[in-house]
Structures are given as structure tokens and as C-alpha cells.
Amino acid sequence: MGKLFGTDGVRGVANKELTCELAFDLGRAGAYVLTETKQKPKILIGKDTRISCDMLEAALCAGLTSVGADVYLAGVITTPAIAHLVKSHGFDAGIMISASHNPYEFNGIKFFNSQGFKLSDQIEEKIEDIILNKKWDEVPHAQFDAIGRINRVELKKDYQEYLKSTLNAASFKGFKIVIDCANGAASAIAPEVFEDLGAEVVVINNQPDGTNINKNCGSTHLQALQEEVVKNKADFGIAYDGDADRTLFVDEEGNTVDGDKIMLLLAQNLKQQGRLKRNTLVVTVMSNMGLFVAAKELGINLEVTKVGDRYVLEKLLEGGYSIGGEQSGHIILLDYATTGDGILTSLQLTKLIRESGKKLSELGKIMKVYPQVLVNAKVENGKKDLYSKDPVILEAIKKVEEKLNGKGRVLIRPSGTEPLIRVMIEGEDYEEIKKDADNLASLIESRLS
């Protein structure tokens, strides 16, 4: 991670940290680095529903066209749709304007290469180097007749058809499903796909107004979905985040089915079909201890990475594996997609539920969830790494670990996208670990404030 790029592109409070000036510079430097050899690169841009997206899109377009790139605006669309469409439609690069699951005041800019993959650290460092060290003399200004043009394109239907093509003509007729679109990019895509496949769909949080994306809804706030599933006597519910790169489920009783359970169910299904490459599932250090126990019982190997879907993807490509993901619902199905795709994952799990003939509550028993507590400590971005050098914090962590005595764990992790340090504790006694996590988070805040 550099000074501009975090674990998921460039992110910050819109118009304060992520300014129009920075978006313009990212457009210029990004187009140059990604398409140096192209005279007239074609770049696809998508956005979610935040109020700041139009402003940042305009600045990006100015930067891109000033170096001669032709821009194609896909409008409001999901992040994984951009990744897919860049490759399927032959664009030279793709850009998504979104801060994913973050509140509306944040926004982000992430790039995809011509194959639909997020950028490597080396490419991001090249872009950063130009911007931070003001190496603009390296970046050409297009001559009058070579300035790029801006075009609007309608590609949503192409993406929806692709999603349906991954299901081998499965039918969801007879299913009643509640879908929470998080007032984000899934609103115009997901409900239509499920309805096309025959499901009866009840949609909530699909009225984006620029400021309500992820607000008490979507995959980070499941309460409304849980209530609607029970009230509507639905078979299950599906939640996405603002840009639909992640998904979580709620069973017919209103219980959460998180990313750990979703990817274990999908991995087990692939294994039964002989399609689980190298018999391996890639997970992160945040996955619940129960997943490790269940995977062993199912005969599935686990590869463990740092938190962040970019690290999951690296491990998938490096090892030649087919599935990996995070507890938060970022799941990468490499046979179908180059990035986490919430709608794709939810379609695959719905197909699995249909073929199993079982209720989701029954399927969810695939693993026993160990009590796990996650508490956020608010710490400025520049101070997030100092916790590991603070003797008082380290001593407090050690004491909690000694108390757990091998029957749990403590994980302290600076967020890659927000000014937070996440304190995660797992153990057998929920009340005890909650108290310890709260105390550790308070200590970290007071020591690093």
C-alpha cells in the first residue's frame, strides 16, 4: 500500500481527501501508465449512487481525455460489472467510482486492467510516483485533434445476461426472496435478474438518493432484511453493499449466513462436483475458527491470507485455486469472475439451495460459529501502525491471549480503507471476550489519540 492507494483503490472523504484535483490527476496518470503503448485507449467508467460520483466522474473524464483517452460512461453499475465488461468488451482499462460499504460521504476510485483485474502494487506505485512527485512532463498532453471523446454506453443488460449464463438454465420459480440493495448500485441490476429466473422478489432499500447508500441497510446492517424475511415468510434474504462486490444471506428464520458459511457451502458443492481446484478454499485471518474446524472435517484444504480481497485474489492466482473470500461476504469465484461479485455469488448460492432441496437454516449448520467480537478503535490514518510498537498495548494483548489459553485468539488489524484499527477476539465465552475487546479498543484509542 502506498500513500494514495489503500487495499481497494484510492479512498477518502469526497471533496476533502478525494478531491476533483486528485481525480483529474488520477485520470491523467492512470490512463498514461495503463495504456502507454496505445495511441487512443478506450476506458470504461462506472459509478455507484453517492452524491459525489458525478463530480468525481467529471474530473476523471477531464484527466483521461486530456491525454487522448476515449471514455465510455456506463452510469450507475456494480464494481464487478465493470471488471467483467472491461474484458468482455475489449476496453483497455476500467475505472469504478465507489467507496463500497463505506458511508456516503466517502468515495473511492479503483482501476481495472484490460483483463478485468485490480492493479498490482507496482502499477499503483507508478501512478502514485507521477502524481506525488509531479512528473507531469512524462505525461503527454493530447494535440487538439487527439483529445479524447466522452461516450455514454448501456451495458447493464449484457452483464445481466452474463450472470444468468453462469447458472446452466437454473430456475428459481417457487422461491420467495427478499433483496436488500443497500440503496446502491445493485438496485437496478439484482432484482431484475432474480425475477427473470422466476423468483418472487421483495425488494428493500432500492431508492438511492445520493446520501442513503449503506445507511442502516445492506450487508453491513442486516436488521431490516432479517425483519422483512420473517414478516414476508420468505425462503431467505440477500443483502449487498453499495457497489455489490459483497453479499450476505439471511435464512428463513432471520439468522445471518455470513461469508464464511457461504464460501464453505460453495466450496463443498464444488468438491462434490469435482470442480474444487486443488481441493482448496482461500480464506483470510478474519475467518471464524469454526470454519477451520469444519473445513478439516469436510476434507477441504485452507490457504490463509491477510485481510483484503486483493490478497485473496493473489493467492488464488498463485496457487491455481477456484474459490476464496472473506467473512464480510467478498467472495471470488475465479471460474466466473476476476473480482468479488455479490450478485454472482448470491445466484450461485441460490442455485445450490434449490438443488439441495433443503432450507437455508439447515444448510447453515455446515459449521459451528465460535463467539467472535469485532470492535473498532478510531485512530488517524497516519498513526494506525503505531499500535505494534506501543509496549502498553502489546502487554494488554498478551494478557488477553494468556487468558484465552489456546481456546481463542486476538487479532489487531488496521483498516485498509478507513481511519480505524479493528480489534477482533474469538473465544468460548461471549461476555468475556466482548469486555476484553471493548477494553483493548479503548486502550488503543487513548494511547494513539
From Swiss-Prot:
Gene Ontology molecular-function annotations: magnesium ion binding; phosphoglucosamine mutase activity; phosphomannomutase activity
UniProt key word NAD: no
Binding positions (Mg(2+)): S100, D241, D243, D245
Superkingdom: Bacteria
Keyword terms of this UniProt record: Isomerase, Magnesium, Metal-binding, Phosphoprotein
Cofactor remark from the record: Binds 1 Mg(2+) ion per subunit.
Modification type Phosphoserine: residues: S100
Active site residues of this protein: S100
InterPro entries to which the protein is assigned, alphabetical: A-D-PHexomutase_a/b/a-I, A-D-PHexomutase_a/b/a-I/II/III, A-D-PHexomutase_a/b/a-II, A-D-PHexomutase_a/b/a-III, A-D-PHexomutase_C, A-D-PHexomutase_C_sf, A-D-PHexomutase_CS, Alpha-D-phosphohexomutase_SF
Reaction catalyzed: alpha-D-glucosamine 1-phosphate = D-glucosamine 6-phosphate
Broad enzyme group: isomerase
Pfam family, one: PGM_PMM_IV
Gene Ontology BP terms: carbohydrate metabolic process; peptidoglycan biosynthetic process; UDP-N-acetylglucosamine biosynthetic process
Required cofactor(s): Mg(2+)
CC annotations in GO: cytosol
EC number: 5.4.2.10
Biological role: Catalyzes the conversion of glucosamine-6-phosphate to glucosamine-1-phosphate.
Family: Belongs to the phosphohexose mutase family.
PANTHER family documented for this protein: PHOSPHOGLUCOMUTASE (ALPHA-D-GLUCOSE-1,6-BISPHOSPHATE-DEPENDENT) (PTHR42946:SF1), PHOSPHOHEXOSE MUTASE (PTHR42946)
Protein name, as recorded: Phosphoglucosamine mutase
Organism for this UniProt entry: Caldicellulosiruptor saccharolyticus (strain ATCC 43494 / DSM 8903 / Tp8T 6331)
Source lineage: Bacteria, Bacillati, Bacillota, Bacillota incertae sedis, Caldicellulosiruptorales
Recorded name of the encoding gene: glmM
